[in-house]
């Protein structure tokens, strides 16, 4: 699933190509995504100019002034810039044609993503209003994690992946951040000290920033706005390495299921 770094990579890839350009036409080839694409979306978007492209958690928001297009890439989706004459592939579901011979194409093999119309643009939409702070913003800190974790008995990894606590820390990056911070994913969130949460917050920032700079992690279908895969997966130290030696102490990494997600940790380095 595309996580925050992959969505931010997509935003950075497509924004320079579409910002300031007028939408000429929207072609919906397959409206049956996670939620049906609104029937009035093509008419609402046509003739509007893209003012900016922003990201909130794993959602991409294309601002058109009075309206906003909300994209979620789901489990396997991607947005990329193509030439208008580029042949459409099997899972290409939406084309947004813009002036200057630019086409923004949405591809989603599993169709778990979405394209919605927000009118007017609002952070009060049900998909957005209950989200926690951005992990790369000033609102995110070790102090915040510490305060929100008190009395919680759930594992710290589950707590870290709660989108109401902090957005965008999916399974890959939660594994990596906890490894970097030396915190075992099974430890109760309420038992982690303020000092260790401060270390964890910095680890989250580093892991996500590094992933963004490397174009995200391509494990299955993800490609950026330029159609190229990311390469952060080449630097993974925990995720996907169960049974392999720890890169720090050479202890065999342990792999377990935690909340139906795979968790990998070092029994020696993480406590």
Curated annotation (Swiss-Prot):
Transmembrane segments: none annotated. It comes from the Bacteria. DNA binds at residues 91, 110, 152. A zinc finger (FPG-type) spans 237-271. One of its GO terms (biological process) is base-excision repair. The active site is at 2 (schiff-base intermediate with dna), 3 (proton donor), 58 (proton donor), 261 (proton donor). Its EC number is 3.2.2.23, 4.2.99.18. InterPro entries: DNA_glyclase/AP_lyase_DNA-bd, Formamido-pyr_DNA_Glyclase, FPG_cat, MutM-like_N-ter, Ribosomal_uS13-like_H2TH, Znf_DNA_glyclase/AP_lyase, Znf_FPG/IleRS. Keywords: DNA damage, DNA repair, DNA-binding, Glycosidase, Hydrolase, Lyase, Metal-binding, Multifunctional enzyme, Zinc, Zinc-finger. SUPFAM superfamilies: Glucocorticoid receptor-like (DNA-binding domain), N-terminal domain of MutM-like DNA repair proteins, S13-like H2TH domain. The keyword DNA-binding applies. Its cofactor is Zn(2+). It catalyses: Hydrolysis of DNA containing ring-opened 7-methylguanine residues, releasing 2,6-diamino-4-hydroxy-5-(N-methyl)formamidopyrimidine; 2'-deoxyribonucleotide-(2'-deoxyribose 5'-phosphate)-2'-deoxyribonucleotide-DNA = a 3'-end 2'-deoxyribonucleotide-(2,3-dehydro-2,3-deoxyribose 5'-phosphate)-DNA + a 5'-end 5'-phospho-2'-deoxyribonucleoside-DNA + H(+). One of its GO terms (molecular function) is 8-oxo-7,8-dihydroguanine DNA N-glycosylase activity. Binds 1 zinc ion per subunit. HAMAP family: Fapy_DNA_glycosyl. NCBIfam families: fpg (TIGR00577), PRK01103.1 (NF002211). Monomer. Belongs to the FPG family. Involved in base excision repair of DNA damaged by oxidation or by mutagenic agents. Acts as a DNA glycosylase that recognizes and removes damaged bases. Has a preference for oxidized purines, such as 7,8-dihydro-8-oxoguanine (8-oxoG). Has AP (apurinic/apyrimidinic) lyase activity and introduces nicks in the DNA strand. Cleaves the DNA backbone by beta-delta elimination to generate a single-strand break at the site of the removed base with both 3'- and 5'-phosphates. This is Formamidopyrimidine-DNA glycosylase. The lineage of its organism: Bacteria, Pseudomonadati, Pseudomonadota, Gammaproteobacteria, Oceanospirillales.
